[in-house]
Amino acid sequence: MDKLLKYNGVQEALKFLCEDDERTLKEHLEMCQIPAPSYEEGEKAEYVRKKMVDAGLSDVHIDEVGNVLGTWKGTGNGPRIMVAGHTDTVFPKETDLTLKKEGERYSCPGIGDDTRAVAELLSLARALNATGIHGEGDIVFCANVCEEGLGDLRGIKHAFRDMANGHYDGFVSIDDKNTSGIIYQAVGSERYLVTFHGTGGHSFTGFGIPNPIHAMGRAIAKISDFQTPKNPKTTFSVGVINGGTSVNVIAAECSM
């Protein structure tokens, strides 16, 4: 790392990033005003696509699931790296995105996770273009969709499964306001939707028939008794439950 930091091109790129801060902030705040819940990132994706073109990336396009990708070409056959930040936020489309400023501090829903990272991606692309740095391998910039919640990393999973677009030797995700460290080999995750089915019926006249909600409750109770290893740290949670139509109706279906 010390050797890399001494390279003139890297020094020039770092200087450019500092000088580009005002533009980066401007684009950051503009993107904050674009609603982008998971599965509804289209408007923000188009904004990012245009900015990637302006930044000098090649093969800029929006893929089948809505990811925006652009490539900074390398000089040879070196490792191919993806650098990514996700376009979706956790906030519903109707959320008030009014931007507030107190002193030098800006605030609004989604301003951090992960809109700032997308602005940083664009600035990094401009820095490479301005300084002409080219490594041996390609750097693929990706503004990926559906990272949050039930999006379940849909965009980035698609990017890695899309072999027509080539393989990746490394992946860097910008996804935290904390710049004091790097997480190496991040935690994996699995998400499941489990649905319980029954015939349904009236809670009085149909009393005694199998009740999916009761079954789901028993399942949740058993899950809560699971014992997991401390190393590697392993966690679980039943995060959302849905089902039922009325207080006096035996549900025909429920899910967790």
Where are these regions (language model features)?
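Acidic-enriched catalytic cores of C-N bond-cleaving enzymes acting on peptides and small amides
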Residues: G206-I250
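Short glycine/serine- and small hydrophobic-enriched flexible loop segments
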Residues: E30, L122-A130, R218-S224
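Acidic/histidine-rich catalytic neighborhood of metal-dependent amide-processing enzymes
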Residues: R105, G110-V187
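Short glycine/proline-enriched loop/turn "hinge" motifs that connect secondary-structure elements
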Residues: F91, I133, I183-S189, V247-A252
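Acidic/His- and Gly-rich active-site-bordering loop/insert found
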Residues: K3-R105
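Short glycine-enriched loops at secondary-structure junctions
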Residues: G85-V90, D96, D176-T179, A186-S189, ...
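Short, conserved micro-motifs enriched in small and acidic residues
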Residues: Y39-G42, Y106-A119, F207-H214
